[in-house]
Every structure is written in C-alpha cells, then in structure tokens.
C-alpha cells in the first residue's frame, strides 16, 4: 500500500457531488485509493457526515443510498479503513478541549493522529493555523486537497 492518508467528509463528498471546488484533485485522490497508491483511513463517522452533506444540498434520496452503499463496500473491500469512534475518543476529547473544534472535526483529527496518517481535508476549521500546528506537534500534517496531490 501507498502513503497513509486520513480522509474526512469534506474530501470524500467531492467523489460523488459533481461541480465542487477541487473536484479534480478529489477524484485523483479517489483514484489513488482505488489503485492502492494510497492507504486510506477515516473515522466511521464519514458515512454519516457524507450522507448529511448530500442531504443538505438536496441530493436525491436513492442516490444517497447508493453513495452510502459504495462507501460501505469500499471499507469492506479494504480500500478504506473506517476506524470506530471509540478507538479515537480519548484523543478526540483532548483535541476538542484544546482547540474548540466541532466533535466530528476532533474525531477526524484524532483518527489521523492515532493512525499516524496525514489528514486531507477541505474543512476550514481543520485548516486553521492553530489546528495545523497542533497536528505537527502530534507528528502528522494536515493538508488541503491542493497540497495532497499524488
């Protein structure tokens, strides 16, 4: 397997919703995951967060079910490791308290830290300077899609 990258929903949703900013970079990353050039890891919350994002923009219900099924299949086939929230919970609580992040953002960052993977995100909260500095102190990088190209 290739480089270890942790993915959040702000990246993965671009695999399914066309016309998004940085769509080409997201699709390149998806191809890297499917081609085993990237060892992808995420929180199991990715499923819910991706569904929520698609519901929010009015994506058709049947298509949302397909997206969910596709993501479940990618994890069951080993293309993406979905880490249980409980495995990252203690670190996520520490992060949330230290950085005043949303719970889901804290879980994504904690997952990246415990797996020693670079976190790829388009989430502005996770790209804040203090969050990036915290991640560096924890031994990982936080990258935008533009910075994470294979």
Each predicted region: which residue ranges?
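Helix-adjacent hinge/juxtasegments
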Residues: 54-83
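Acidic, PIN/NYN-like endoribonuclease modules and their adjacent C-terminal/linker elements
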Residues: 2-4, 78-81, 109, 113-150
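Alpha-helix capping/helix-boundary segments
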Residues: 11-12, 46-47, 88, 107-108, ...
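Acidic catalytic patch
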Residues: 44-46, 72-98
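A short acidic, often aromatic-flanked loop/helix-cap motif at beta-alpha or helix-coil junctions
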Residues: 48-49, 88-90, 145-150
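Short, well-structured N-terminal submotif of metal-dependent ribonuclease cores
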Residues: 1-42, 56-66
């Amino acid at each position: 397997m290739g480089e270890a990258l942790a993915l959040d929903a702000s990246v993965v949703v671009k695999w399914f919703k066309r016309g998004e900013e940085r769509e080409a970079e997201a699709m390149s990353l998806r191809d890297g995951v499917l081609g085993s050039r990237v060892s992808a890891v995420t929180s199991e919350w990715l499923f819910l967060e991706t569904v929520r994002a698609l519901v929010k923009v009015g994506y058709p219900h049947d298509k949302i079910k397909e997206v969910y099924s596709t993501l479940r299949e990618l994890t069951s086939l080993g293309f993406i490791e979905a880490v249980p929230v409980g495995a990252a919970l203690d670190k996520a609580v520490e992060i949330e308290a230290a950085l005043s992040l949303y719970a889901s953002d804290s879980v994504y960052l904690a997952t990246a830290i415990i797996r020693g993977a670079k976190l790829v995100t388009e989430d502005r909260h996770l790209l804040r300077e203090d969050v990036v500095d915290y991640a560096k102190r924890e031994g990982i990088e936080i990258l935008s899609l533009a910075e994470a190209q294979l």
